[in-house]
């Protein structure tokens, strides 16, 4: 198999890796209970989505 003929510089390596970072989680507050949840998903604490109760959540007390 062919091998690289010339060595790549640190700048070229870093330019290639510029898009390899992780993006932070975009959590938003639930309008019903106020706890943080992922957007476009059912709240795991109160079970609501877009103002409607979708799932029944048992209290973890």
Swiss-Prot record:
InterPro entries associated with the record: Ribosomal_bL32, Ribosomal_bL32_bact, Ribosomal_zn-bd
UniProt keyword terms in alphabetical order: Ribonucleoprotein, Ribosomal protein
GO cellular component assignments: large ribosomal subunit
Gene Ontology biological process: translation
Alphabetized GO MF terms: structural constituent of ribosome
Stated family: Belongs to the bacterial ribosomal protein bL32 family.
PANTHER family to which the protein is assigned, alphabetical: 50S RIBOSOMAL PROTEIN L32, LARGE RIBOSOMAL SUBUNIT PROTEIN BL32
Full protein name: Large ribosomal subunit protein bL32
């Amino acid at each position: 198999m062919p091998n690289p003929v010339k060595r790549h510089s640190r700048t070229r390596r870093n330019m290639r890796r510029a898009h390899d970072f992780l993006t932070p989680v975009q959590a938003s507050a639930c309008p019903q209970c106020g706890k943080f949840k992922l957007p476009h998903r059912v709240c795991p604490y109160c079970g609501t989505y877009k103002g409607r109760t979708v799932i029944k959540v048992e209290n973890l007390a």
